[in-house]
């Protein structure tokens, strides 16, 4: 009788004792990696090219028959016939498609000889959505209606195939929802495994049933680029499914950024710069602000309308993001440290010299007036994000390498914090400050009013001063001795002060230990954010001028404890911080 362990994991049941791709115990290697290794080992090249095959070109050699019979058992990617027109496009990051062939895991569809591909049917759907009505009828055909049969269009969509075997790299991805932990309350969260293409070049093929001239083919490819500009596959609003040098036709806002911090890691501890962290931050701040103005159900629903989600029925949000950068502008590093009594640890770091965050309208039918309102709201949320925090891991804390290096010099402390900046034309997004308290409090009040107006457009009546609010750790409403938030700030005339308070008593024997959060097995999210923000004046011509001292900002979500009460009294009576909000 055959041994069940000889059966490839691909064909084993997702039950205990067989193949549980979503289960990882005692820091062991996830079964997903063995699953992927069994699938992809045949496709790795034996040469020194790292699995690469020649890139496609427009020659007839590339357009050979896509025939698994002729080239069975070949590790070379499938190729199109001579009649097909093809173009390669490279992903900016990852692409998620669900073949729907496995229980409990999302993975790409598999075609001839086990190659993953982007299905022609999905390609046709994306193309049709980018067409005018006339173009859709001509190219894609007329679907059947009642007694009337369907009429085929002139185009045949052949799908998209990897141009080389680099698709086998970095397939294991994770979806790690943390909204509950980040905003509402601490709790255990699980990272779910999925398989997605990572920075793969796909060659897309289209053929026609009739002869077309070059001008018409240019029109067809323009429509296709409009389609992929909106993103392909799933999770496009979080930065998946985007392609290099193909801008979104629905872009509302472009923000140029630079930043440094701690790199995210996958299940196997591989570090990866993950652009979905931008949407996570913007969505999280939306939920915080709405949570301070209305009840939980309404706050979550309005957040889902704006950014999308799967709470209840899956919803395509009004806004989505993509993030692009040149490879030369992103550098990775390491921070080694040895905690007392333990072995050396390595923390992966990133330093991004320049990148562009694009925020797009996800609904093409949105009116020009509503687009403008969404653009203004998105701009304000981005400004709020960089005013009080950052993006990615450790976003609540100021970058210690830049602002508190002595803490790291002994080599026994982990890296903490991040630091993000507006650059180039986006420097205009910095808030000009004449009066620290008035200018920043007005900005926060104005943003809350924008959310009030947004909610009204969705049919909800809320008000910034509404006494109804969510009982969350980080719901954004004025502190009332039970919950809420306070923002404190100071212009740094001498030195940055608060960064040291997280590591030593800030007054006498009083520390922030119970307020700053912790990492490890029993991690807790801190109630304090600390940000070093550039100080800009607006001159007589309305142009921003950078001032030498920065601004130090503390955002505090107090709880009804003695630690919180003492720290508030200290800030108010015995520090040079002023209460901003």
Identify the meaning behind each predicted range:
Residues 1-581:
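Basic, Gly/Ser/Thr-rich N-terminal segments that form RNA-phosphate-binding interfaces in CRISPR RAMP
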């Amino acid at each position: 009788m055959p041994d069940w362990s000889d059966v490839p994991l691909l064909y084993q049941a997702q039950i205990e004792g067989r193949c549980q791709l979503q289960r990882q115990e005692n820091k062991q290697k996830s079964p997903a990696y063995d699953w992927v290794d069994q699938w992809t080992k045949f496709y790795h090249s034996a040469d020194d090219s790292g699995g690469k095959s020649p890139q496609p070109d427009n020659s007839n050699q590339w357009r050979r028959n896509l025939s698994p019979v002729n080239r069975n058992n070949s590790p070379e990617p499938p190729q199109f016939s001579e009649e097909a027109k093809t173009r390669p496009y490279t992903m900016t990051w990852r692409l998620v498609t669900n073949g729907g062939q496995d229980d409990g895991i999302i993975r790409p569809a598999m075609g001839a000889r086990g190659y993953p591909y982007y299905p022609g049917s999905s390609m046709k759907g994306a193309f049709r959505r980018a067409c005018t009505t006339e173009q859709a009828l001509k190219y894609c055909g007329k679907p059947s209606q009642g007694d009337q049969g369907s009429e085929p269009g002139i185009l045949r969509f052949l799908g998209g195939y990897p141009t080389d075997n680099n698709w086998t790299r970095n397939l294991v991805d994770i979806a790690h929802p943390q909204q509950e932990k980040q905003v509402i309350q601490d709790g255990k969260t699980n990272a779910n495994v999925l398989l997605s293409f990572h920075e793969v070049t796909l060659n897309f093929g289209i053929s026609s049933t009739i002869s077309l001239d070059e001008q018409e083919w240019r029109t067809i490819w323009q429509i296709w680029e409009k389609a992929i500009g909106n993103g392909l596959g799933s999770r496009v609003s979080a930065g998946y499914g985007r392609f290099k040098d193909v801008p979104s036709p629905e872009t509302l806002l472009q923000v140029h950024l630079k930043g440094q911090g701690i790199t995210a890691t996958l299940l196997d501890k591989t570090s990866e710069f993950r652009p979905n962290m931008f949407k996570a931050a913007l969505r999280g701040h939306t939920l915080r602000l709405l949570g301070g103005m209305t009840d939980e159900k309404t706050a979550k629903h309005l957040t889902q309308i704006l950014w999308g989600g799967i709470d209840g029925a899956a919803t395509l949000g009004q806004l989505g993001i993509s993030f692009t950068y040149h490879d030369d502008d992103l550098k990775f590093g390491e921070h080694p440290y040895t905690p007392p009594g333990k072995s050396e640890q390595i923390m992966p770091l990133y330093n991004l010299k320049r990148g562009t965050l694009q925020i797009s309208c996800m609904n093409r039918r949105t009116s020009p007036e509503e687009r403008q309102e969404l653009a203004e709201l998105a701009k304000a949320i981005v400004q709020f994000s960089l005013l009080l925090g950052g993006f990615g891991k450790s976003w609540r804390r100021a970058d210690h390498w830049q602002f508190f290096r002595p803490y790291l010099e002994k080599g026994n402390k982990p890296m903490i914090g991040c630091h993000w900046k507006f650059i180039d034309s986006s420097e205009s997004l910095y808030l000009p400050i004449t009066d620290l308290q008035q200018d920043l409090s007005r900005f926060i009040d104005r943003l809350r009013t924008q959310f009030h107006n947004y909610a009204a457009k969705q049919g909800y009546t809320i008000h910034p001063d509404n006494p109804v609010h969510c009982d969350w750790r980080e719901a954004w409403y004025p502190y009332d001795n039970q919950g809420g938030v306070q923002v404190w700030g100071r212009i740094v005339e001498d030195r940055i002060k608060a960064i040291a308070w997280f590591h030593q008593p800030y007054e006498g024997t009083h520390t922030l230990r119970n307020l700053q959060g912790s990492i490890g097995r029993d991690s807790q999210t801190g109630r304090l954010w600390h940000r070093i923000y550039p100080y800009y004046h607006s001159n007589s011509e309305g142009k921003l001028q950078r001032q030498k001292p920065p601004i130090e900002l503390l955002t505090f979500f107090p709880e009804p404890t003695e630690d919180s009460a003492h720290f508030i009294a200290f800030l108010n009576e015995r520090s040079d911080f002023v209460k901003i909000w």
